[in-house]
Amino acid sequence: MESQQLSNYPHISHGSACASVTSKEVHTNQDPLDVSASKIQEYDKASTKANSQQTTTPASSAVPENPHHASPQPASVPPPQNGPYPQQCMMTQNQANPSGWSFYGHPSMIPYTPYQMSPMYFPPGPQSQFPQYPSSVGTPLSTPSPESGNTFTDSSSADSDMTSTKKYVRPPPMLTSPNDFPNWVKTYIKFLQNSNLGGIIPTVNGKPVRQITDDELTFLYNTFQIFAPSQFLPTWVKDILSVDYTDIMKILSKSIEKMQSDTQEANDIVTLANLQYNGSTPADAFETKVTNIIDRLNNNGIHINNKVACQLIMRGLSGEYKFLRYTRHRHLNMTVAELFLDIHAIYEEQQGSRNSKPNYRRNPSDEKNDSRSYTNTTKPKVIARNPQKTNNSKSKTARAHNVSTSNNSPSTDNDSISKSTTEPIQLNNKHDLHLGQKLTESTVNHTNHSDDELPGHLLLDSGASRTLIRSAHHIHSASSNPDINVVDAQKRNIPINAIGDLQFHFQDNTKTSIKVLHTPNIAYDLLSLNELAAVDITACFTKNVLERSDGTVLAPIVKYGDFYWVSKKYLLPSNISVPTINNVHTSESTRKYPYPFIHRMLAHANAQTIRYSLKNNTITYFNESDVDWSSAIDYQCPDCLIGKSTKHRHIKGSRLKYQNSYEPFQYLHTDIFGPVHNLPKSAPSYFISFTDETTKFRWVYPLHDRREDSILDVFTTILAFIKNQFQASVLVIQMDRGSEYTNRTLHKFLEKNGITPCYTTTADSRAHGVAERLNRTLLDDCRTQLQCSGLPNHLWFSAIEFSTIVRNSLASPKSKKSARQHAGLAGLDISTLLPFGQPVIVNDHNPNSKIHPRGIPGYALHPSRNSYGYIIYLPSLKKTVDTTNYVILQGKESRLDQFNYDALTFDEDLNRLTASYHSFIASNEIQQSNDLNIESDHDFQSDIELHPEQLRNVLSKAVSPTDSTPPSTHTEDSKRVSKTNIRAPREVDPNISESNILPSKKRSSTPQISDIESTGSGGMHRLDVPLLAPMSQSNTHESSHASKSKDFRHSDSYSDNETNHTNVPISSTGGTNNKTVPQTSEQETEKRIIHRSPSIDTSSSESNSLHHVVPIKTSDTCPKENTEESIIADLPLPDLPPEPPTELSDSFKELPPINSHQTNSSLGGIGDSNAYTTINSKKRSLEDNETEIKVSRDTWNTKNMRSLEPPRSKKRIHLIAAVKAVKSIKPIRTTLRYDEAITYNKDIKEKEKYIQAYHKEVNQLLKMKTWDTDRYYDRKEIDPKRVINSMFIFNRKRDGTHKARFVARGDIQHPDTYDPGMQSNTVHHYALMTSLSLALDNNYYITQLDISSAYLYADIKEELYIRPPPHLGMNDKLIRLKKSLYGLKQSGANWYETIKSYLIKQCGMEEVRGWSCVFKNSQVTICLFVDDMILFSKDLNANKKIITTLKKQYDTKIINLGESDNEIQYDILGLEIKYQRGKYMKLGMENSLTEKIPKLNVPLNPKGRKLSAPGQPGLYIDQQELELEEDDYKMKVHEMQKLIGLASYVGYKFRFDLLYYINTLAQHILFPSKQVLDMTYELIQFIWNTRDKQLIWHKSKPVKPTNKLVVISDASYGNQPYYKSQIGNIYLLNGKVIGGKSTKASLTCTSTTEAEIHAISESVPLLNNLSHLVQELNKKPITKGLLTDSKSTISIIISNNEEKFRNRFFGTKAMRLRDEVSGNHLHVCYIETKKNIADVMTKPLPIKTFKLLTNKWIH
């Protein structure tokens, strides 16, 4: 870079102050700045980089071009005329040209301001005092290297500066940014130092060492201007220069002050990070030092919070203060002041002990708000106060620590201290005892505490008032003393076994005895100096000996670490045995914990692992000696035998040895287990485990599936966790070759994060032993936990998680540490742990009423990962909660069915273990805790159903089968909660499976025909049909039918009273059937039996010829010849081979299908699409016999808890007959709010597009004068009901454009602010389809238009106000609306009236009567849908004329003019249309479905076997009672609404072949069972697989110029619940399917003929309306046809015999149909059933039949 620059400027031959710097800067040895200059960074890489980045252009080169340099003459350079500095203040020639400096001071060399060109300085003469610059780049520097010095010159005069003139000096770099100015000033100061100007640089007090000369001032001014361009100067520098542009010294002084301040901050931070305190200096001084540093940093803008400050202080504590690290590290809200109180207390106690004064220290663990007790996990804190004189110390209780202290030091084999030793013995480590001194531990000490910090010694404690010892072999005259109360430093009780004498035999052959207490619950044996002083023995820490008052030396003292010790060899042994001493005093407080209890508490781990863990303090709160290990050797846990049964062990030592060289958390093993079958959908089926190679730390995560995105989420989570929590980076992950690990997505993720995947070789499972062994261990534990607790299987992952928590805390036999210890974490506090499945009572924070019991029975699972609470399973609520508000249940009963656990009752042990935690709960109860039983992230396990048999038992107790009164309800407080056992009842879920979680897939028994006989009187039939409840509790309905029996009884298990039905046979003659009708009371009519009516007697009509074409009167507009062939011609009917017609007797036709369950729905009878969607109400009122099951709340059986509390989840009885209409199906929300689109949108590109759309919308609103901009109203002045909330919504349209819309919240608009009679009309879909069909047949041009901001063209009459848009920032103001804003109730109606008036008055159109939004004139037809217009015309110019007229008033955009003769593609109201005039039209939604369906989160199977049909015949939806908790129910209903909403949209647009399935599933929106959801998923899957299908139309070629409108009708008799029939109609115009309808008959039909009549009567009104529309749009004659495959229906329509109408209802229906057919000139024709395409609208069909009926018109 430098060579390039110099080559551009050959005139720089002798060097220049502007030359590019390519080497490190050279420094002198003087530093007048004292602090700041010494801290200035070396000018090395930064300066080189700054210069190397300069370009070679004249504008930015490090050596700016100077055209005047070639011949620098005084007259040739004009003075500067502009610049940042004032022209009148420029230096005079005399000032800039001092004597003796002619070349540098020449006026031509004064830099032009504002630095229009940089001056090129010629080298001064040899007499000059200023330095010369290198003549070439390659010239070596004769100055010292940068490493040789980094200080400034400290001269007192200018003469001294000139005594060490350097030959060559490198200039500073050019300043390129204001942010770089602080670093640049440092290099500039070094430049001045190297130029022998160090004496003029201001010192720390702001004054230079010497006075600056005029020549030096000129040099300073010019060089500063050269290398610091004005545009790059900071603001404060510019402010100084604006006052005095030559005051460079002030700038330097200010810069040095800032550098000094920065240096002080750095020093403070370093000091704070390296604090050290051990009590050698006063605590006040230490506190003052620390607080001054923190205050200084805070004042300089560096905020040090309490948490960070306390951590830094605690890290520097040592000696007796070190323990504060461990007692304080969990206190989250600790302050510096509180920490220093503890430090002061220890210091004062230390000083007081040394001065023989009473001492006291506040216990640092006594926090007011601390609800837990934390165990010190390090060596003792307060037991080693060793003053030189302790004779006058006050007696205090012993302050010792439990054995839970950590110890990682090796043991000592012996200790040896010379008898003549009088000098202090200082031991730096335990091995220093091997000093050649022969004093081994006495053999009488049979208790070898090899884990002691100094084995075989007593710890001298000045703070202990009593002597305590763990070994029973040194206690003489032991006796029981239960009244002694001893506490440790944390004020915790120390259980005492016995009291006795401790006898010493010192080296002067004297014997002494003191009192001693025996306890195994301390870390070290303590020798109280107070008790020694009582027998005239003192400790001299000057000579390190124990001595009497006369100076007699008794024993040496050993100093090890911070403490002083005396050997146990001076103790005399006793003859008492350990069992004797342990039995001297037995109480509840000293009783050891039984091993079976600890075994179960610690997740059924083996005894060896538990002992290692207790021995190494990885499990805290108690030690190894607190456990009774006598039964551990031969103890067999029955649950372990069952849960951990195995064949053989894994092969060990199979992984590579090089993995051991990795650091913690750099090498992970992972594996996936699953699936676990027969679980609820909400429970995880898999889990993925991770194991760290070094620490063996384990993680487990639940999975519901093994999809790529699920696995990727887990990997992302664990990598972030390790990075943030352990500051480590994962380098390698070992895994098997499963597809979930080898997929491309995960491989890219690992590659992006720099992680090496290590896969096992094929069929080499041994190489993956770490992960596989972990999974096996966890599964063994899981099975054992579930077996032991009796909890349902869907909680299996909670057992896995509990086991993981415990396993991470258990020590490894090899490393003797736990995974938590290896990871640097504290040990597991077992006092916070409960056995898995422990029965508890949880406080109900939100009871149903004030008198409702406050306790909810539950089972403890595992500690919470997110709080200090516990995860508890509540069977009655079917969910888990995270809470601390619980009480442990106690009981003495047997805990297992198979095993006798009477001898293993651990209630007392559990109470002792959780005593501290109990006090915490009690305090919370007193303070009225606000714990809200937060639902944990384990609620995925809460979906579990009671076994049907269990619920039947509950019902049998709650409801009397003979009592007619409602059952009484017993609340929980009617019975006292009995003592419970640890095991949950087996009835919860003994064999959980999908069959008893979801409604049974077994179909109920079908109605049986007891006798079908043909009688001589006309074929009398006897049909006994059982009364079936709308919802059955059991899987099967019991019914017995005798061939001759006429009595039938059915009991409804859901009714409050038993109903007996007696079937009364009804016989009739003359062609009728005998049937049985139940005698029911008026209250039972809703449960009546609906029997089949006799079929219509068609015997008389059979003799007559049955015409296929009904002769009717014709009008003049109808052709005279209407034959069946002309009606059926050109219809898209299937091609069938000719078959002879097969006539079936009507009586046989009317028999009910044998496999049709009359109360079940199939995808042949799932019922109506009508379904309520309102789910907010807690109680839904359904019609007919809907019942809410009210079960007694008798809970917790006194015998082994054989029944759970009846669940609070609402039982929803499946009753399709109660559903009347689809109120609304919630659409899929495709819009975004303002905060989603802009405020919190992380996609920058998308955010910018939404911002542009936002401003575009605002501009359009202002352009349309939407509101009054002349005045803003105060909110208090306006009636609140006239104020409408407003909001912005954003969405991305299908064409990729981003749109914003400002809308009003019309959903909360007050009714007084609009006219409810006004309607917002849009074009009916049938009208659009009719117009498109006519356009194809008549070669019409189709033009698509869009009117921008259509609603804003309509004025608003009402006085309404809205809040201004957010960008105006006037939240407290209102503006008055002038236009119909989107969202207002009246906006749609206002726009409709506005555009309607304009089309009629200005465009000459008229609206078709009966069809809103369809306008026509002689040439053009317009279909209007809000702001979208579709124009149809045979002449394109007619369309253009309409467009021109519209553009005069509205902002009209032409979406598609439609002028091409080739295929044109449209997107009209969601339909994707391909149209070629005169040939064909194809209607589909492929692109839309491809975009929308994946957003539904439906598990699609793109590569699997495609469904050939949306459903299969014979598949029935079970109507078992569905019981879900409210949130789960609402979630599933909402999911059903989304799925069915999309399916309905597609079906009614063009996929008429799916309408039956859509309608059927829509009836079950409020019954979202697993079966219903699975069927819905299959329907969506079928739509996805066939998303490319299209409705195909071809141009018709009629023989005569007529339009032919046909409806094909069909009905499926009695195939819906409660014997309702399904009816379907398909409408065709000129052979093209334009619409379809499938629905359940609103009335119950009594025969097939009646069902067909009902179907036809439903189709006629729409057929007539369509006929009117076709005649209005196209003046051709029209032929209307009605096709059915029911000959009996045709016979009734054409017959004049009224005797065929057996009752008034049927007669009126048939007569009306006769009138409609004759009055509307309908041609009724017969069509074969195999060709009846309407059959797909009424029932599920086999795949072959379904394809045959649909492949002609949709493919």
From Swiss-Prot:
PROSITE patterns: ASP_PROTEASE (PS00141), INTEGRASE (PS50994)
GO BP, one annotated term: DNA integration
Post-translational modification: Initially, virus-like particles (VLPs) are composed of the structural unprocessed proteins Gag and Gag-Pol, and also contain the host initiator methionine tRNA (tRNA(i)-Met) which serves as a primer for minus-strand DNA synthesis, and a dimer of genomic Ty RNA. Processing of the polyproteins occurs within the particle and proceeds by an ordered pathway, called maturation. First, the protease (PR) is released by autocatalytic cleavage of the Gag-Pol polyprotein yielding capsid protein p45 and a Pol-p154 precursor protein.
Region (RNA-binding) residue spans: 299-401
Any one Pfam family match given in the protein's UniProt record, by short name: RVT_2
Positions that bind Mg(2+) 1: 671, 736
Residue numbers spanned by region Integrase-type zinc finger-like: 583-640
EC number of the protein: 3.4.23.-, 2.7.7.49, 2.7.7.7, 3.1.26.4
Residues engaged in binding Mg(2+) 2: 1346, 1427-1428
Subcellular locations according to the entry: Cytoplasm; Nucleus
Recorded catalytic activity of this chain's protein: DNA(n) + a 2'-deoxyribonucleoside 5'-triphosphate = DNA(n+1) + diphosphate; Endonucleolytic cleavage to 5'-phosphomonoester
Chain span(s) of sequence motif Bipartite nuclear localization signal: 1178-1212
Domain of life: Eukaryota
Note: Retrotransposons are mobile genetic entities that are able to replicate via an RNA intermediate and a reverse transcription step. In contrast to retroviruses, retrotransposons are non-infectious, lack an envelope and remain intracellular. Ty1 retrotransposons belong to the copia elements (pseudoviridae).
Domain comment in the entry: The C-terminal RNA-binding region of CA is sufficient for all its nucleocapsid-like chaperone activities. Integrase core domain contains the D-x(n)-D-x(35)-E motif, named for the phylogenetically conserved glutamic acid and aspartic acid residues and the invariant 35 amino acid spacing between the second and third acidic residues. Each acidic residue of the D,D(35)E motif is independently essential for the 3'-processing and strand transfer activities of purified integrase protein.
Name recorded for this polypeptide: Transposon Ty1-ER2 Gag-Pol polyprotein
Organism the protein comes from: Saccharomyces cerevisiae (strain ATCC 204508 / S288c)
